[in-house]
């Protein structure tokens, strides 16, 4: 078998579909990394609270242990199961509970029906990616907090700062700066993982390629094309990560 006879001209009529798919991929990534950052910070702080001074109240100590257990279970589930399964679970199991014409927890009636028809796939995909990203970002934050020398925490306590003040003014600012390259790498992962959302009918890049492949029974051209788009997006993000890893004086600041 020789090299494939590529016919790039078949993509011309589908250019708007690929543009819309690329924009949808970027939107999914932005929503997931933003929501995942908020969720990951909360989970990371809960997981790291084991190093906090022991509360005087037994009830508060018990509540803290329970929250840490829940956080560990959450992170373990979303890091230990396939993202594809998580997307299907959110779309076909969780989504009908939250938004349903009959008795949705968040939305019901005609508004729920219209929302699911127009935005259901995006909501499910963004939610699944956000929940998954939150688990990974929480571990990034926990590692960032642990990378701060314990002497800084002890010094902050010695001048009268509470644990919360120490985290806010001393630990978190440094940890968040160290997290930036890892967060960009997580964004790169989300860009590539967003292709899985095509399984629930969201019109992103993978679905655009599948549409062209189905119309012409040709696979090289559409899938090579979206591979190039994914590569451009991830190279831009990877370049950003490398730039952020450089010392500030080398970045020109």
Where are these regions (language model features)?
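Transmembrane alpha-helices and adjacent helix-loop boundaries
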Residues: 1-253
